Amino acid sequence: MKLTCVVIVAVLLLTACQLITADDSRGTQKHRSLRSTTKVSKSTSCMKAGSYCRSTTRTCCGYCAYFGKFCIDFPSN
């Protein structure tokens, strides 16, 4: 019974700490996460559409066409 009370108090304390920390950090994130395709194209140098590629290496900004062996951009929606 005593152990159960200690565990309950510990869980409540940790929950309160997380809520306080979450309120303090709201709106302070400097770099918002980008979409994965945008992040990849901005973080690495990649080959533009029409360039020669191999399907085993991920060097295209979009994707490497399997049969033609050239880079193709992702379709824009």
From Swiss-Prot:
InterPro entries reported for this sequence: Conotoxin, Conotoxin_omega-typ_CS
Tissue expression notes: Expressed by the venom duct.
Compartment annotation: Secreted
Keyword terms of this UniProt record: Disulfide bond, Knottin, Neurotoxin, Secreted, Signal, Toxin
Origin: domain of life: Eukaryota
Entry annotated with the keyword Kinase: no
Residue pairs linked by disulfide bridges in the UniProt entry: 46-61, 53-64, 60-71
GO cellular component, one term: extracellular region
Major location category of this protein: secreted
Signal peptide: 1-22
Residue stretch(es) of the prosequence: 23-42
GO molecular function, a single term: ion channel inhibitor activity
Additional detail: Found in injectable (milked) (IV) venom.
Family stated for the protein in its record: Belongs to the conotoxin O1 superfamily.
Domain comment, as recorded: The presence of a 'disulfide through disulfide knot' structurally defines this protein as a knottin. The cysteine framework is VI/VII (C-C-CC-C-C).
Function: Omega-conotoxins act at presynaptic membranes, they bind and block voltage-gated calcium channels (Cav).
Protein name stated in the entry: Omega-conotoxin-like CnVIIJ
Taxonomic classification: Eukaryota, Metazoa, Spiralia, Lophotrochozoa, Mollusca
